A protein has these predicted regions:
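Conserved PLP-enzyme active-site core in the AAT-like
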Residues: 1-189, 196
């Protein structure tokens, strides 16, 4: 996310993002992008009227996760993309928690999709990596900046990621089955008020 936002935004630009998101992403946007003159606006997750109202001539990107972290709110990607297209603002979805097994935001027309490969894609909690998807021409500035910032992955990290991808489909099938069973059990439990699943 750092490479994408730093390569696509300049002083005076603004981004609007739904407030349910990974705290480090929110921290980077609110504390660090502001030092470079980029304005960050947060709106309640799923409130597309509030998101539209926050958009102005300086808005360059709409940002969300789907599902969100930590509440697992599924964002309506069709509305998200439609709002971006109607206002000519680029869209970014962090789909880490869904993984490409469950959700492919590019197929909805999202401009950029992020995944933390450290989590489900790697699967063994032993690598740090990320994935950014989008049009090749739109990613060219990111490729340039990542070399400057030093965020190029080692061959060993890529080996670990490839190892994780070999079992990715099986792990996600089991993860989905187990998650469904646990959610159904908890929904029936008398001491549980609400289940986020």
């Amino acid at each position: 996310i750092v490479g994408l936002l730093m390569s696509r935004l300049s002083a005076g630009d603004e981004i609007v993002f739904f407030d349910q998101c990974y705290h480090r992403s929110r921290e980077f946007c609110s504390k660090h992008l502001s030092r470079f003159g980029v304005v960050t606006r947060q709106v309640p997750t799923g409130d597309f009227d509030a998101m539209e109202a926050a958009i102005n001539a300086n808005t360059k990107m709409l940002v969300s996760e789907s599902p969100t972290n930590p509440h697992l709110t599924a964002v309506d990607l069709e509305k998200f993309v439609a709002l971006g297209k109607s206002t000519e603002v680029e869209t970014l979805i962090d789909a880490t928690l869904a993984t490409p097994f469950n959700l492919r935001p590019i197929e909805f027309g999202v401009d950029f999709v992020l995944h933390s490969a450290t989590k489900y894609l790697g699967g063994h909690n032993d690598l740090l990596a990320g994935v950014l998807c989008g049009r090749s021409d739109a990613l060219a500035p990111v490729r340039s900046l990542r070399g400057i910032l030093g965020s190029v992955n080692s061959a060993h990290n890529m080996y670990l990621l490839e190892r994780g991808l070999k079992t990715f489909e099986l792990r996600m099938q089991r993860h989905n089955e187990n998650g469904q069973r646990i959610a159904e059990f908890l929904e029936q439990h008398p001491r549980v008020e609400r289940v986020y699943y």
